[in-house]
Amino acid sequence: MKPRLLNSFRGYRYRYRYRYGYRRKKPEIRNIDKGIIHILASFNNTIITVTDVKGHVIYWSSAGACGFKGPKKGSAFAAQKATESVIYRVVIKRAAVLITGCGKGRDAALRVIQHNRIPIRAVVDITPNPHNGCRPPAKRRV
């Protein structure tokens, strides 16, 4: 086994973080004129993404990123908190909402957007629907 250098830069970095902690960036509030709010509501999690018209991601959040773990990530309350965290960081003058998935968080996220008085141009459900494509997985037997 190779002996490790005590004065290596890697060791210094870890010692510095141990002593002084991580430096946290302050959250920036971003202003955009037109934007698209993508809501991906699966049964296990809800992911909210704000993009500009070209599709470049400006900010995103999810129920897991807001501190929820396990089955609580799929709840409507977790989706509400994730949407609030996005809306407080991004100021949008006009928005279109694209909803994907059929989880519990889709209605809760849309309700938060409407409650914060963001002018919504369109609400579109873009959940993929197979025209008899792949065979679905077998049903669970408990």
Curated annotation (Swiss-Prot):
<dbReference type="InterPro" id="IPR001971">
    <property type="entry name" value="Ribosomal_uS11"/>
</dbReference>
<dbReference type="GO" id="GO:1990904">
    <property type="term" value="C:ribonucleoprotein complex"/>
</dbReference>
<dbReference type="GO" id="GO:0019843">
    <property type="term" value="F:rRNA binding"/>
</dbReference>
<keyword id="KW-0699">rRNA-binding</keyword>
<keyword id="KW-0150">Chloroplast</keyword>
<dbReference type="GO" id="GO:0003735">
    <property type="term" value="F:structural constituent of ribosome"/>
</dbReference>
<protein>
    <recommendedName>
        <fullName>Small ribosomal subunit protein uS11c</fullName>
    </recommendedName>
</protein>
<dbReference type="Pfam" id="PF00411">
    <property type="entry name" value="Ribosomal_S11"/>
</dbReference>
<keyword id="KW-0687">Ribonucleoprotein</keyword>
<dbReference type="InterPro" id="IPR036967">
    <property type="entry name" value="Ribosomal_uS11_sf"/>
</dbReference>
<dbReference type="GO" id="GO:0009507">
    <property type="term" value="C:chloroplast"/>
</dbReference>
<dbReference type="GO" id="GO:0005840">
    <property type="term" value="C:ribosome"/>
</dbReference>
<keyword id="KW-0689">Ribosomal protein</keyword>
<dbReference type="GO" id="GO:0006412">
    <property type="term" value="P:translation"/>
</dbReference>
<comment type="similarity">
    <text>Belongs to the universal ribosomal protein uS11 family.</text>
</comment>
<keyword id="KW-0694">RNA-binding</keyword>
<comment type="subunit">
    <text>Part of the 30S ribosomal subunit.</text>
</comment>
<keyword id="KW-0934">Plastid</keyword>
